[in-house]
């Protein structure tokens, strides 16, 4: 279990990692490849996403995270119809039609996505997070206002902890 070129994968969880006194940085590539087919119409669907994630912190109270994604997707027809009618990809916003000289990719979409935030903890009871991101509360829960269907948006999150009560304020654009 030796690091690749004495630099990469020094720890199994991170492609590249810097961990020194009062500073850490973790860099990870992201890859999502998936394929399927729509049974009624026999149309092949796929998801080809590549990206990079950076996560770090300064001291114990300042932290940041950013992710960049490049995606080529061929959705099932019912999602393509919706995407074409509203002009946006769910969760990612604007797209362009993707074409390839090697493969039949009629109806495929090409889009970029970037998210980032910076956070500060003021002691153990109050924390702030400012960025361009999506919010998810819980695992699989959706509220009237927060959804994984939305695109990333500019926001300020304030977390407060008093006794056993954890309170979040989210101010979003």
Regions from the PLM with identified roles:
Residues 1-173:
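Outer-membrane beta-barrel channel domains
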